[in-house]
Regions:
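C-terminal terminal-subdomain/extension
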Residues: 3-4, 76-132
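Short, charged beta-turn/beta-strand-edge "cap" motif at the junction between a beta-strand
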Residues: 25-29
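Compact nucleic-acid interaction/catalytic patches
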Residues: 32-34, 40-75
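Hydrophobic alpha-helical segments that mediate membrane insertion or helix-helix packing
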Residues: 38-39, 113
Length: 132
């Protein structure tokens, strides 16, 4: 087992920075799939009112660690193994896909996540920077 399990109730409140085990199937092409941890990225107001969540998948396969959208984290937030958050794979999931709560990432880790989201969405690119 790679994470702790916490049973979710019907009145569960999702929070930004939370980790959940979610069923990412069905998928297409290069999208992350299967039952895997996801990190909630959406703001807490959206988490409360919307039936969906904005998430990033988490994997224990630490390939391409040097990408500006891959954040390697240690055994944190209920994860039992070093893992990598793939912030180029941000997607929307229905809350019903979340199977159980794993834990929450630290404020310091979420600050790093925020920087990588800016990279992923092109929010840090200056006018003179261009893609190859």
């Amino acid at each position: 087992m790679l994470y702790r399990k916490h049973k979710m109730r019907d009145d569960w409140v999702f929070r930004r920075g939370d980790l959940y085990l979610a069923n990412m199937n069905p998928f297409k092409g290069s999208e992350q799939s299967g039952k895997r941890p996801v990190l909630v990225l959406q703001n807490n107001a959206g988490n409360f009112y919307a039936p969906t969540l904005i998430v990033a998948p988490v994997t224990t396969r630490l390939y391409k660690q040097d990408l500006p959208t891959h954040l390697v984290i240690g055994k944190e937030g209920g994860l039992y193994e070093r893992s990598m958050i793939e912030l180029e794979q941000i997607r929307v999931l229905d809350k019903q896909r979340c199977m159980f709560y794993i834990g929450r990432l630290s404020k310091q880790t979420m600050e790093k996540v925020d920087e990588m989201i800016k990279n992923s969405l092109g929010l840090m690119i200056t006018e003179d920077m261009e893609a190859p």
